[in-house]
């Protein structure tokens, strides 16, 4: 039969039906105690085999078969094993149906089991029942969690609990005392180490089912014997904790099964005093945490209970510290603390009232007691080795319950502190901080030894988040003092903390650090957070905000963020790239964000620097620090000694060279008062202070620094493609690179070294184009636009650059009014327009140039801050107009002021200069250098002194110690002195130039006082001549063997007049740096030309023939250098021409004049052309003079009268004659012993242009002895006219129209030579008629026209008529230009 049943159970459904019928029939036949059970066990075994083969399709029929058998079987007294086999088979089938997901069959079978009474034949049978009930409970709880059959699952859970109650009652009835084993299985399978969700779902089951199970369990435990108490204690604690969780969520607040269990347990362990007292303490503690209403004595009760706990642990159990029950009790307390602290933040927490009563009055005291309790438990937990209550770590390397317990105590302490909401006055109470820090620090120290912890560990994540929350709640220094001691232990856990969690904590600490009492600690904490930011943009903004907040508080920045981070108690681990990013961000924040960083801050960055590049950039901010300067010198020397330099090395060398350049420029500056800038005190001034060291040799060191910088920067850009920068290199500070390049270019421009400054500005032009820096590009282009001619060496196509600049300007100038540009940028744009106008004027596009200047005027008027002020834009605009005016061949606007008047206006504006931007000061200095050259050229060609620009420029260059610029000013001054024939001043300028060139130092002896002239006659004559005219026209009338009064006493240290002039060409005595520099050679050559002119004017023509010949050859052999001379080239040609006429080499003079006319550049004064024309015509006349009658000796008819004042013009003719008589009488009295004079009369046939222009290019042939032809350089009446309405003198001898009486026509007879002896006779004075000018004519400014430019010298200042003389005698006049 067994074989048939086994086969049929594994067969089809009909076969199983047959088995059911067979079993039903069989049980009708069987009777007795043992046979039904034996047969039933056999059938159950075959059903188990069928389920084993996964044949669960007929599980419902299997349950029907078991439903037939179960009610008919009972335990067999003779065979206990059969009942055990019966229960085991039922358990197997129940488990098998659950595993095979036969839920309905499982429910059906379980109902069959629970419908039968619980029969425990043996004591061990309860285990099978217990296993069946727990399996059924856990299985349907899983279904309930998955929301599958929720109603049925809930019913099955209740059935299981009720069945457990029946089991516990049966055990009590059978007096089975194996409670410890039962509780172990219950805790392992049902209550122990379950989740909160399990207990929450269990608490919501019907209370009747729970009560039935729990009451039966309590009765069973109460009947336990004392022999099993040792094993029962930890299980009771475990069950208590489970019931506490059930009570937490139970809707019936008065149930509190955990307290019932503890009351029963106290009775159970009453013989064990320590265990009983421990359970009693736990009972009261749990009772206190389940308080449902606020009580007035809660704080006192809790403090008292905590003190009892501490007393119990410290005194009563001191001798039992290592016993197992104490370890279990400490673990139980830890688990209980975890329970009550986990729910403290929930609004509907069952312990909400418990935690609420911690607040209010005496809040610090109760929290102190709570923290002390946790600290005491944590300190005793060190003796825990094992405990069944302890959590089982999933990590194989960690089996320590002790470490997890201690860590849990620390987390609970932090939870309690987070829950604390102290009042404002309670925050200052730090009494709870000590026990809190004790337990937390201890737990953190233990955590670092745990091998199971990592970035994903729950404990570490919770610890960091708790600290984050604590930091977020900081509102005072006392609360911040809780966090500070925890930072160092936390740093030891840093490898276990995830970067995201640490970043969040550091962010809260960053905010909380504002309440830190120690500013240094606050900076360290803030640095930790800043280091944790990996996003470059966010890091930059946060670092800048950090410095902004420090500056807002007025706190001095002592260290950089990078250095603070290195010393912080909680450093953020950084990779080398992240460290570099942090330092670079901190570094550039100081450079670009902080306006005036502290020295300590910059020194901190220097200490932490990773390359020399950082040092040289910071040195730009620390020019006055000697130690930094020494370090820069060391870097500079080190880089110069290296054979090959990388791109970054070149960049460092460039910045270091600029730093040394600026330091040297600053060191040579001195204060010079404007009162000291007087022409007769120049030599004494240069011998004072540190100006005596001002020479080209000293300045060459500065030029070398600047050249090194430009060369290094150029190499950095040239090798960009061959040597790209790697990601590890420091970020390039392009702004600092541009600034230093501009500073170098400005320094070279200020010093005046043309070739070097061209290279610097060309590099800036490239940089502006490559970096798309529009304003740098325009600023560099301004330099080349302002030049008369760009050097071909640069290979610069200026026309193409102008096209690019015009596109940029078209885009920029409409935006200038928006207010988004700085004033220096506005200035750059407007200056570019001005220089473009100058460029187009050189291209003879005068209309376009004037339109550009008009556009600048209109654009400038749109800025209120510039209106009514003399800014650099206005000065540049007026300078360009002045340049266009005095260089233009055919002026188009006749109403423009004359060039000299424009210079006066420009001078007034320079004196009232207003500095509006950082660009204006340097631009003004460069503009003044140009104005010195151009104003000197303009005024010298018009025989006028305009020394104010030279005075201002000299003041600036002397204060800056610029030797080359000083030489240029002295050369311009020397040119003016020679034109005005101030020989002593000219000799002084030569000495000053030689001093600055380093050829001959000035004599440091004091300046000798000028000796008085003993000859009274000569003294009176000199004083009279000085008053009459500063150009000393009477000097040209003295005898050839008489020395000039100005030259009677030469200064001891004047340039040796016998010194060879060829030295200026051969450079025999010149220093080495002068022989190597073409620009210095040009200046030295110009000095020689002016020195030769001085020799000529001093009647010393001994070496002039050879010098002018060699000078001509020098200019022919060196065209680039000669073309760089500009106006001095034409002046030298005029000087040479004067000498040739003096030497009667008229053919050569004519060729020289013609060559000068052909070589005239567009960038020189138009008067040079007129002077060449005048000299050419004069030389032609001298070559073929007009026939002359023999001169007749006549008596002197009148004395020489010069420079009538405007008041004299109002006098009558009689008054004028009287004045002339008085003057002649005075001259006669003062010159009784004076030498003879030779006075020539004017020829009627002499061309007016020859007489009017002969002195424009120089002094003419002053030393030409009397000859058969008329001397063209004879003394002429000086003609100065300010009258705009004065008629122009035509080339013909026509009678001019006048409102006054018409002038008589002069006779056409030739002048006769009059010989005077030592005494002058007073003869009848001719009548003089003066043309009266209107008041309006005197007030108006002269208007220059093309005709007046050439013929203004013909305007008659005064007309002397001799009505009674039969032959009218007229004194030959020598005019000088005044336009």
UniProtKB/Swiss-Prot annotation:
<dbReference type="GO" id="GO:0007424">
    <property type="term" value="P:open tracheal system development"/>
</dbReference>
<dbReference type="GO" id="GO:0007442">
    <property type="term" value="P:hindgut morphogenesis"/>
</dbReference>
<dbReference type="GO" id="GO:0051301">
    <property type="term" value="P:cell division"/>
</dbReference>
<dbReference type="GO" id="GO:0005737">
    <property type="term" value="C:cytoplasm"/>
</dbReference>
<dbReference type="GO" id="GO:0007502">
    <property type="term" value="P:digestive tract mesoderm development"/>
</dbReference>
<feature type="compositionally biased region" description="Low complexity">
    <location>
        <begin position="1248"/>
        <end position="1267"/>
    </location>
</feature>
<feature type="region of interest" description="Disordered">
    <location>
        <begin position="1206"/>
        <end position="1231"/>
    </location>
</feature>
<keyword id="KW-0132">Cell division</keyword>
<dbReference type="GO" id="GO:0008258">
    <property type="term" value="P:head involution"/>
</dbReference>
<dbReference type="GO" id="GO:0007443">
    <property type="term" value="P:Malpighian tubule morphogenesis"/>
</dbReference>
<protein>
    <recommendedName>
        <fullName>Protein three rows</fullName>
    </recommendedName>
</protein>
<keyword id="KW-0498">Mitosis</keyword>
<comment type="subunit">
    <text>Interacts with pim and Sse. Cleavage of thr contributes to inactivation of Sse.</text>
</comment>
<feature type="compositionally biased region" description="Polar residues">
    <location>
        <begin position="1213"/>
        <end position="1228"/>
    </location>
</feature>
<feature type="region of interest" description="Disordered">
    <location>
        <begin position="1248"/>
        <end position="1309"/>
    </location>
</feature>
<dbReference type="GO" id="GO:0008406">
    <property type="term" value="P:gonad development"/>
</dbReference>
<keyword id="KW-0131">Cell cycle</keyword>
<dbReference type="GO" id="GO:0007440">
    <property type="term" value="P:foregut morphogenesis"/>
</dbReference>
<dbReference type="GO" id="GO:0002009">
    <property type="term" value="P:morphogenesis of an epithelium"/>
</dbReference>
<keyword id="KW-0217">Developmental protein</keyword>
<keyword id="KW-0963">Cytoplasm</keyword>
<feature type="region of interest" description="Disordered">
    <location>
        <begin position="1328"/>
        <end position="1379"/>
    </location>
</feature>
<feature type="region of interest" description="Separase cleavage-site">
    <location>
        <begin position="1031"/>
        <end position="1037"/>
    </location>
</feature>
<dbReference type="GO" id="GO:0051306">
    <property type="term" value="P:mitotic sister chromatid separation"/>
</dbReference>
<dbReference type="GO" id="GO:0000070">
    <property type="term" value="P:mitotic sister chromatid segregation"/>
</dbReference>
<comment type="function">
    <text>Required specifically for chromosome disjunction during all mitoses; maternally provided protein is sufficient until mitosis 14 then zygotic protein is required. Involved in formation and/or maintenance of epithelial structures: bud extension during Malpighian tubule development, and foregut and hindgut morphogenesis.</text>
</comment>
